[in-house]
Amino acid sequence: MNATGAGYPLASLYVGDLHPDVTEAMLYEKFSPAGPIMSIRVCRDIATRRSLGYAYINFQQPADAERALDTMNFEVIKGRPIRIMWSQRDPGLRKSGVGNVFIKNLDESIDNKALYDTFSAFGNILSCKVVCDEHGSRGYGFVHFETQEAANRAIQTMNGMLLNDRKVFVGHFKSRRERELEYGAKVMEFTNVYIKNFGEDMDDKRLREIFSAFGNTLSVKVMMDDTGRSRGFGFVNYGNHEEAQKAVSEMNGKEVNGRMIYVGRAQKRIERQGELKRKFEQIKQERINRYQGVNLYVKNLDDGIDDDRLRKEFSPYGTITSAKVMTEGGHSKGFGFVCFSSPEEATKAVTEMNGRIVSTKPLYVALAQRKEERKAILTNQYMQRLATMRAMPGPLLGSFQQPANYFLPAMPQPPNRTFYSPNPVAPVRQAPQWTSHQSRPPQYQPPAPLMRAVPPRRMSSNISTMKQASTQVPRVAPHSQRVANIGTQTAGARAQVNPSIMRTMPHYKYSCAVRNVQPIGTNTHLQQVMEPAVLMQGQEPLTASSLASAPPQEQKQMLGERLYPLIHEMHPTLAGKITGMLLEIDNSELLHMLESPESLHSKVEEAVAVLQAHQAKENSQKSAQQSLI
């Protein structure tokens, strides 16, 4: 076959049936003897980055690709035979069905290579596959020929032939829609009737006597178990459709042996499963529509809260149809669900109860979501971060080298979030377990924050918010002139920049989701450009992106180290308890509290009230116990 023909303008191969651990390097080592390779890409799941089991290899010359196809097809890599075919970029060629042959009733011992060797005598094969599951061959497969004439020859010769002592069916491939239309027409002319629920006191003779009144019965069978007792169902096959239809109409729902029997058209197992699945999906969708916008998810529940207490807490906001705390082994799992009678009541409950402290714990309340919805939202968030990372230009990534032979660029994620300048700066307390200089990639230079020199200004509080600017003036400067952003100052007014300087400066694109590298000059007045960040004396700036990039177990630690000194100023003796209570709140809400002293003060006072009420309750219980003694 000529790979340079009209259908295959590129020397590109599809390699399938790959082991999940196969990498680009392994494929390069395997295929490079065939000729120079331009690129190799193992396709991976966009969220988990796991291999999807296939890859594309682009050769420089079509002859090299053809040589690899002829000599390496079905070779074994990591214990699995690979399957190679030409990469067809036009989906119309793959889906047209021209030259595609379907084979069924295959012996379990026949694999892709055996099927390929058997049918290659009839013409050039584009692809060949035996369908398998976790248990092995499913007994059918497909062979896609280059021409329809070759497919016709294969069908005429092989249909009804024996392969490994089994008679196989070979025919033209039909799409599922075509098969369903054909099967639907046959279903309307059924002659086989299914009867169930007639009990154990039934045999073939008795069943024939009952159903022979509607026409000529070709066969009657009551299904038996191993002991010879009736399993309660059977089949009756009539000579024509009219007789079968009459039996169904007359006997369905009638009483036999004191039982109401079911009589209907006999169905294949896959058809019954399909109908049950459609029925289940319909019921599921109706339930989803019924509870859309009225079912609330409540988490961070105290262990002492049960169904009645949960209903009591939410009852002021509307009529509750159900309230359930999820348990395991009689112990609360810390979350539950509350269903209201209307979306308006549910919305009001979310507004009032989200973040409210109940039994020393702040609740998280939101509309309940199905697992598929949550997964889709998380995947969308991941894709947005991934797109932002890929939008960064090369100079911003320092000298970190990207692995070769990848279509999708690797995302450098430096483990260190703090860069300490060699210049003397104010001492900074390093957070434990957050940095590991040994884990940096070779030649990787940590990025410095973007700075614009502005007159410093004193702040009356230990906390401030950095406002993001919209312009940058990049200048190249030595490494020693980069400084870390440490302190409690905030950016002032936007600095004026000489237009002549702007014309000579290179322009870069910046991302708000990651920390960008910006070389700066020594003589240019620059204003710092960052996303909104919480600044604390002696600590690195905390932004939403830097918090999200940290491991989940460290996020609360980062927030707690910034919350504690602020709470300690308000209530020194209760700072530890209050900080622990507030850390149960969602991270985004905690960031807002750090940026808004009013919001923080409100939550702290609410927590103090809960602690005081709890202490008063304990004191009264102790007094009661002492009086009894």
From Swiss-Prot:
InterPro entries for the chain: Nucleotide-bd_a/b_plait_sf, PABP-dom, PABP_1234, PABP_HYD_C, PABP_RRM1, RBD_domain_sf, RRM2_I_PABPs, RRM_dom
CDD domains given in the database record: RRM1_I_PABPs, RRM2_I_PABPs, RRM3_I_PABPs, RRM4_I_PABPs
Region forming the signal peptide: none
Subcellular location: Cytoplasm
GO biological process, one term: negative regulation of nuclear-transcribed mRNA poly(A) tail shortening
SMART domains: PolyA (SM00517), RRM (SM00360), RRM_1 (SM00361)
PROSITE patterns listed in its UniProt record: PABC, RRM
Subunit structure: Interacts with dazl in an RNA-independent manner. The C-terminus can self-associate and also interact with the C-terminus of pabpc1, independently of RNA. RRM 1 and RRM 2 interact with both eif4g1 and paip1, and the C-terminus also interacts with paip1. Prior to oocyte maturation, found in a complex with dazl and pum2 proteins and spdy1 mRNA; pum2 dissociates from the complex during maturation. Interacts with the translation termination factor sup35/erf3.
Function: Binds and protects the poly(A) tail of mRNA with or without an AU-rich element (ARE) and prevents mRNA deadenylation. Stimulates the translation of mRNAs to which it is bound during early development.
Similarity comment text for this entry: Belongs to the polyadenylate-binding protein type-1 family.
Protein name: Embryonic polyadenylate-binding protein
Organism of this sequence: Xenopus tropicalis
